[in-house]
Swiss-Prot record:
Domain DRBM: 170-235
Main location: cytoplasm
UniProt name for this protein: Ribonuclease 3
Co-factor(s): Mg(2+)
RNase III domain sequence ranges: 14-142
Reaction catalysed by this enzyme: Endonucleolytic cleavage to 5'-phosphomonoester
Family statement drawn from the similarity comment of this UniProt entry: Belongs to the ribonuclease III family.
Cellular component per GO, a single term: cytosol
Organism: Gloeobacter violaceus (strain ATCC 29082 / PCC 7421)
Lineage, opening ranks: Bacteria, Bacillati, Cyanobacteriota, Cyanophyceae, Gloeobacterales
């Protein structure tokens, strides 16, 4: 769809959205590609036409490349394993959805009826849309010039936070390692106490409750519960772990 085929209202919406990124060369942006990046598959399933699936695939690969390059240059002492762990957080649905919310992407995302009331899928929709926008920016110029200036500061800020976290953002894995250090074979038990959404989980280990967490998805609720439980266990057994 060329720019002339976009309705004046939609084009105005796209211009407002693009302005949030303070692009270095806004005139190079393809409005047709940006429009497509903001069409969720639920809309194309309902109304026909193109959606952002392919752009999301491209954007996912670009994000992984940029995150890997950033970590490679940021700290020469990071091992491959450490870089992999940090990158997995940088490009996670939760991290990307938070970035998308910062740019109000949901306001411009076109979704079908089947998805409009699906709160459970909101994080994935936002993350996929964000990746699709990355893909659209790349295809607009054929390079990373429209992406690096605004994305790298986000990666730097998040990477700093993740690397300062001993769990590297994977609280469930860190909690499991911790419980096994304290008692061989001991695994945390996640108990669903509110079927939601939002979902709420409690984490039990060593015969007692250590934390709880709430989130729009079961995965996120468990991670939040594990984060609190990890901190509580570390505090309670600090001497034993030294």
């Amino acid at each position: 769809m060329a720019e002339s085929a976009l309705t004046p209202l939609r084009l105005a919406q796209l211009r407002r959205f693009a302005a949030r990124f303070a692009l270095s060369e806004p005139e190079a942006l393809s409005w047709e590609l940006l429009h497509r990046a903001l069409i969720h598959p639920s809309w194309s399933a309902q109304e026909g036409g193109e959606d952002n699936d392919r752009l999301e695939f491209l954007g996912d690969e670009i994000l992984r490349l940029l995150a890997a390059e950033f970590l490679y240059r940021a700290d020469p002492e990071l091992t491959v394993g450490e870089m992999t762990a940090v990158r997995s957080v940088l490009v996670s649905d939760v991290a990307l959805a938070e970035l998308a919310e910062g740019y109000d992407l949901g306001e411009f995302l076109v979704v079908g009826r089947s998805a409009s009331g699906d709160e459970r899928g909101r994080i994935t929709r936002l993350a996929d849309g964000f990746e699709a926008v990355i893909g659209a920016l790349y295809l607009s110029t054929g390079d990373l010039g429209l992406i690096r200036p605004w994305l790298l500061p986000h990666l730097a800020h998040l990477a700093e936070s993740v690397m300062a976290d001993p769990t590297r953002g994977n609280h469930k894995s860190a909690l499991q390692e911790l419980t096994q250090k304290l008692a061989a074979g001991e695994l945390p038990e996640y108990r669903l106490v509110d079927p939601g959404p939002p979902f709420r989980y409690e984490v039990w280990a060593l015969g007692r409750l250590w934390g709880s967490g709430e989130g729009p998805s079961k995965k996120l609720a468990q991670q939040r519960a594990a984060r609190g439980a990890y901190a509580a266990l570390r505090s309670a057994f600090d001497t034993a772990l030294q």
